[in-house]
Regions:
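Short, ordered loop/turn segments at secondary-structure junctions
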Residues: 43-45, 106-110, 114, 146-147, ...
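N-terminal glycine-/serine-/threonine-rich beta1-alpha1-beta2 phosphate-ribose binding loop
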Residues: 1-98, 222, 370-373, 386-389
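Alpha-helical support elements that line or immediately flank enzyme active sites
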Residues: 149-161
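Rossmann-fold NAD(P)-binding glycine/threonine-rich loop
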Residues: 107-138
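A short hydrophobic/small-residue beta-strand
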Residues: 101-103
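Conserved active-site and cofactor/substrate-binding residues in soluble primary-metabolism enzymes
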Residues: 16, 20, 24, 67, ...
């Protein structure tokens, strides 16, 4: 829809949660002229009734945090962005049934692993419930992030000039110590003795969304998988490590190398690797490269690194500033996808269903000004911030229930 000047009317957005990721997205959303924040839902009682800007440490934005789904819906958003740690169907279902689209960064890419590993109390699958809510409301549901999410899109696109593919690898190789989410790292076993028999299952439980990453790639490659296999290596701390916000005793889990392997006839054909380091002082340890790596074996072969660098002049004197870069690259794929999701047909969609413009950023207003009508995708808008590793977007550690 266009306004009288020919510019596309901003999409009305309501946000859920202002944890690490949600806080950064409130800051970024105000620089997206095609988006307008109209509501904020918070879980923490001490945030209710406060201005969203005050909550995240910026000037007031004129939107007050509320506590109920009814208030969220009453704001009449076109789309809700959900930045909690884990899916919340108590919010998803009524929002979708009300005809409001929803984009989430919480533990969802294709939904395969939620169906397999997270039974709903109703006895039905989360996918079934979400799909029915979309049908009733004529709404669209989409899950994304940096990894899983954009990292797999980059790998898929790199295969466009390759024939006779034999193997595809997408790897995240990052230091995760800047992501201060004690709850998340407790849940995945960091700090527990590396020989604790619970650790492998904990790591798998909270990273199983990366099976979705493998299945998304398989869908795009039109490759039918027999199964997705989980494998791991664990790094034990060689000394007591004090990160200030997290303690890692000697002999505890301080790093890991996880693999999700898409198997065909007992051969790994599509692989998702995670090299996560909380400290370099582990045995074994890995060559953490601080980037995302694509490797494709075929004709020709492809090797590519996606290296995220901070904006020039960024002040990294505080850990929070450094961590904000990771939050930015985790959340911006969600914000930049909103117009494509709003334009998409009703139902559950994946990145395979959206047009190329769903993965495009926006130019700064200082570059394009405020005039013009833009093209079919709307005006050229602003994107603020670069850099970071994306961190633990897959485990949900970039958000919280706040």
């Amino acid at each position: 829809m266009n306004d009288p000047t020919g510019r596309r009317t901003p999409i009305r957005v309501a946000q859920v949660a202002t944890g690490n990721l949600g806080t950064e997205m409130i800051k970024r959303l105000r620089h997206q002229p095609d988006l307008e924040l109209v509501a904020l839902h918070c879980y923490s009682p001490d945030k209710i009734g406060r201005d969203a800007g005050e909550i995240v440490g910026i000037e007031p934005v004129g939107v007050v945090a509320t506590a109920t789904v009814d208030e969220l819906i009453a704001a009449k958003p076109d789309c809700v962005t959900f930045h909690g740690v884990f899916p919340d169907l108590d919010i998803y279902l009524p929002v979708l049934e009300a005809g409001i689209d929803l984009v989430t960064t919480a533990d969802w890419i294709t939904g395969h692993h939620r169906v397999a590993n997270h039974p709903h109390p109703s006895g039905r699958t989360e996918r079934e419930l979400i799909a029915e809510a979309c049908e009733r409301g004529g709404s669209t549901f989409y899950g994304t992030g940096m990894n899983p999410g954009l990292a797999q899109i980059l790998t898929i696109v790199h295969s466009a000039d390759v024939t006779e593919i034999e193997r595809v690898l997408c790897k995240e190789s990052v230091d995760v110590s800047c992501h201060h989410s004690v709850e998340t790292w407790n849940e995945v076993g960091f700090g527990l003795p590396v020989d604790d028999p619970r650790v492998p299952a904990m790591l798998e439980k909270y990273t199983r969304v990366f099976e979705d990453a493998v299945r998304l790639m398989a869908d795009c490659f039109d490759l039918e998988l027999d199964e997705v296999h989980f494998d791991y290596e664990l790094g034990a701390c060689t000394d007591d490590i004090d990160l200030g916000w997290y303690q890692l005793p000697k002999g505890s889990l301080g790093g890991c190398y996880l693999k999700y392997l898409g198997m065909v006839d007992d051969v790994a054909r599509i692989e998702m690797h995670l090299e996560w380091q909380m400290t370099p002082h582990t045995a074994p340890n890995w060559n953490i490269q601080g980037c995302y790596i694509t490797q494709i074996d075929g004709d020709p072969c492809i090797y590519s690194k996606h290296l995220i660098l901070p904006k020039p002049g960024t002040d990294f004197s505080s850990a929070a500033t450094f961590a904000a870069v990771g939050m930015t690259v985790t959340g911006m794929p969600a914000l930049n996808s909103i117009r494509a999701v709003v334009d998409a047909p009703p139902g559950i969609v994946t990145s395979a269903d959206l047009p190329l413009r769903a993965f495009a950023g926006r130019f700064a207003e200082s570059v394009v000004g405020t005039g013009g009508t833009g093209g079919p995708g709307g005006p050229a808008e602003s994107v603020v911030g670069t850099g970071g590793t994306g961190g633990t977007g897959g485990t949900g550690g970039t958000g919280d229930g706040a």
